[in-house]
Amino acid sequence: AIPAPKRFGAPVFVSRPYSIGETESEERAAYVSLNLRVGGQLDPVEYSAYQALDYVLLKAPGALLHDALIEEGFGDDVYGGYANGIREPYFQITAKHLRREQKDSFLRRVRELLTEIAEDGLDHEMLLAAINMAEFRAREANFGSAPKGLVYGLQSFESWIYDADPCLH
């Protein structure tokens, strides 16, 4: 089995340069990403719950977190979601094309919005839509051009490599 990774004792901030096109401005070229370790990979209920949150917060039309951050001027796009299939899954929220000086206000606003959402609750219709989508995908098992056997095999590794039931997810 793959051992658990060593945890950070405190938040880690990383800044790296990247290339932009000659016609692009450096003024709004920053990307800021908040990545939070969440839940337990080997808990199928949490696994499903975070997938639903991913949809409601970032991917659905009218997604709560996505739309609020865009409306407040935090970049041209906000994306991310639940990264699963690893021992310590994480939830990522990334804004692209911000000004560098927006980093701290972006991180603060994300935490404020998540707190507000936790206190006020989720829109039940959006949550039901997320659950219905997940159920439909599971029943249809339509993986596009990928063979079902291959997809199921890869999914089994999400828990099997950690000595858990390969049929967990």
What are these regions (language model features)?
Residues 160-161:
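Catalytic nucleophile-loop/oxyanion-hole region of alpha/beta-hydrolase
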Residues 117-121:
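Inter-helical turn/loop segments and adjacent helix faces that build the functional surface
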Residues 1-44, 55-108, 123-155:
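Non-catalytic beta-strand/loop surface segments
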Residues 164-169:
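Short, intrinsically disordered, charge-balanced linker/junction segments flanking boundaries
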